[in-house]
């Protein structure tokens, strides 16, 4: 039965395991005099696509909108039922890449390093939304095709947090932190996590699939977020 599961289904299961395991993990932060303790979650962000409203209609038909399949950890964000095929310059493709909502002003594709090798795309490491001078690709949907002139990136590892989390860790928006993952006697350290602070945001680290697999995140016994 396990052999019939596709990669995205497996990654979804892994993310759920990670949520449950690290929901009460030691955050590694300094004690807070107000009694607030950050609730650290570390997530594997699988390959995905963000679309503009116009590109949704091109790919799925006039008047089409994204259909929510599952809420993501951050409030207001969701995995859509819709998927697209991503085609690279070598005519190699990644079928059924999940779309995340809501829509954005500009479409972008976030892939792991190994995905880029497979497609023949030399992707820069960028913060989400920083798309200037990035490579493009072709997106294929059931009703049409979109040729992106830019927008394919390897998302920079980062940590989302709210104002109370930032105060507890002693960091500010756009600063850098370190994540330490303890798994099976092998500790992996990820440096230069970009801090992204916003109101109403839950504390969550995003790693891509290559990074999560390298650290054996699924079997981690402890994670620490360090200033």
Language model features by range: what are they?
Residues 1-38:
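Protein-protein interaction and targeting regions used for scaffolding, dimerization, and localization
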Residues 14-22, 26, 60-64, 90, ...:
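Structural signal for hydrophobic packing residues in well-ordered secondary-structure cores
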Residues 41-43, 48-89, 95-142, 147-174, ...:
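Short beta-strand-centered segments at strand-helix junctions
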Residues 187-189:
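Short coil-to-beta-strand transition motifs
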Residues 224-227:
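C-terminal edge-of-domain segments
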């Amino acid at each position: 039965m396990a052999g019939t599961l596709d990669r995205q289904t497996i990654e979804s299961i892994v993310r759920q395991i990670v949520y449950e395991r690290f929901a009460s993990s030691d955050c590694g932060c300094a004690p807070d005099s107000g009694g607030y303790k950050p609730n650290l979650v570390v997530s594997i962000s699988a390959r995905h696509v963000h679309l503009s409203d116009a590109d949704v209609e091109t790919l799925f038909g006039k008047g089409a909108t994204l259909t929510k399949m599952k809420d993501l950890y951050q409030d207001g964000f969701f995995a859509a039922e819709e998927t697209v095929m991503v085609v690279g310059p070598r005519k190699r493709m990644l079928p059924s890449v999940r779309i995340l909502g809501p829509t954005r002003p500009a479409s972008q594709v976030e892939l792991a390093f190994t995905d880029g090798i497979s497609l023949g795309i030399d992707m820069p490491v960028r913060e989400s939304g920083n798309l200037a001078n990035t490579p493009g690709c072709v997106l294929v949907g059931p009703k049409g095709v979109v040729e992106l002139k830019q927008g394919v990136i390897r998302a920079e590892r980062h940590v989302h947090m709210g104002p109370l989390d930032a105060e507890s860790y002693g960091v500010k928006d756009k600063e850098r932190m370190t994540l330490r993952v303890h798994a099976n006697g092998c500790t992996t350290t990820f440096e230069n996590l970009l801090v992204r602070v916003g109101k109403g945001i839950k504390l969550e680290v995003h790693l891509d699939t290559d990074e999560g697999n390298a650290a054996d995140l699924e079997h981690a016994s402890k994670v620490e977020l360090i200033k």
